[in-house]
């Protein structure tokens, strides 16, 4: 972990939810107390999470939420491509080294030899996996060609990383592409990995997929690419995460769904919601193995304080975390 300590139970979710329910109305907005209304970055996630102060715009321009087309898959692909083109240096992102502690299977070379990261962005998730698991091949797809270029360049420039040819990026949108499984299998076969895909890494990506059939198709196609017995490692924004409370009402386009000023989508999930989505996609929740921390539920809210030490402010971040397995039968 490189000396980085990561906590996921900095505060109690139920207590946090009661406080929010008593003070916040999504139809009115208002967000947290003014002292907390600062730029909110999650640990290792880009600042595009912000609602307004992270993405400057002309105030005379109509809100992106006023345009229904902004929530289509094609519009989202375009918005994210523009975003990654603007931030193609990669300095806007931090490596998500905490994923190695949250998903320890990814580090085990005897268990995981092939990983598909869906929505690879700048490569901030792929890099720690490649460094921790010397036998893992990481395929990484994104609907943004700029993101794929950024991730590929980050791997090529990574210091101390051996066998950089273990990474391969490609452009694909699982919500619309019928051939994701074929694409993955062909790339693995060319590398002599004929046993199939061991793991799908799905980190801060489902929140960018339009809800409804787009999400269902996205999950079905990712599961189709996975071998029986393989796992999906999932982490995304959760109910009452700080940025959700900061969005103004005119950027709300659905239940717990918002459009940022740059046109990118932001969704915030409940535990029940993700359980239903992954079950409908044909997956089962992973059970704790011998030696695992049995005090942590397999599917849970991770409650993290992000601290701005300069201003002495703690920001309450809520993420949904879970691991699902594809049945053998």
Mark where each language-model region is.
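N-terminal auxiliary segments of SAM/dcSAM-dependent transferases
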Residues: 1-73
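Conserved alpha-helix/loop element of class I SAM-dependent methyltransferases that forms part
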Residues: 91-112, 128
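Class I SAM-dependent methyltransferase SAM/SAH-binding core
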Residues: 114-181
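A short acidic, Gly/Pro-enriched loop at the edge of an enzyme's catalytic core
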Residues: 180-200
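A short SAM/SAH-binding and catalytic strip from SAM-dependent methyltransferases
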Residues: 197-213
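A short glycine-rich, Lys/Arg-flanked "PGG" loop and its adjoining helix->strand segment in the class I
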Residues: 216-231
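C-terminal alpha-helical "lid/dimerization" subdomain adjacent to the S-adenosyl-L-methionine
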Residues: 238-308
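Core SAM-dependent methyltransferase catalytic element
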Residues: 302-329
């Amino acid at each position: 972990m490189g000396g980085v300590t990561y906590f996921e139970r900095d505060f109690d979710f139920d207590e946090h939810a009661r406080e929010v329910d008593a003070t916040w109305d999504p139809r009115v907005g208002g967000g947290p107390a003014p002292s907390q209304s600062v730029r909110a970055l999650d640990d290792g996630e880009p600042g595009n999470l912000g609602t307004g102060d992270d993405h400057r715009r002309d105030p005379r321009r109509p809100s992106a939420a006023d345009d229904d087309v902004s929530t289509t898959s094609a519009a989202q692909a375009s918005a994210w491509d523009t975003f990654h083109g603007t931030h193609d240096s990669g300095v806007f992102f931090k490596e998500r080294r905490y994923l190695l502690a949250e998903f320890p299977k990814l580090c085990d070379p005897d268990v995981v030899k092939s990983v598909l990261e869906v929505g690879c962005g700048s490569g901030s998730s792929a890099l720690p996996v490649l460094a921790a698991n010397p036998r893992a091949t990481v395929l990484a797809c994104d609907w943004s060609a700029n993101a794929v270029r950024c991730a590929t360049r980050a791997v090529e420039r990574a210091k101390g990383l051996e066998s950089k040819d273990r990474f391969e990026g490609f452009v694909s949108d699982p919500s619309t592409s019928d051939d994701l499984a074929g694409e993955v299998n062909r790339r693995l076969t060319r590398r002599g990995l004929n046993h199939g895909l061991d793991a799908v890494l799905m980190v801060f990506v489902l929140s960018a997929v339009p809800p409804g059939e787009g999400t269902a198709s996205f999950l079905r196609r990712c599961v189709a690419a996975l071998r029986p017995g393989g796992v999906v490692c999932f982490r995304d924004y959760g109910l009452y995460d700080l940025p959700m409370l900061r969005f103004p009402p005119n950027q709300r386009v659905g239940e717990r769904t918002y459009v940022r000023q740059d046109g990118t989508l932001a969704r915030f999930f409940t535990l029940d919601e993700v359980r239903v989505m992954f079950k409908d996609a044909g997956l089962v929740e992973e059970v704790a193995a011998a030696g695992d921390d049995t005090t942590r539920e397999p599917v849970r809210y991770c409650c993290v304080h992000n601290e701005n030490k300069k201003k002495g402010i703690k920001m309450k971040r809520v993420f949904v975390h879970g691991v699902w397995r594809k049945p053998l039968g």
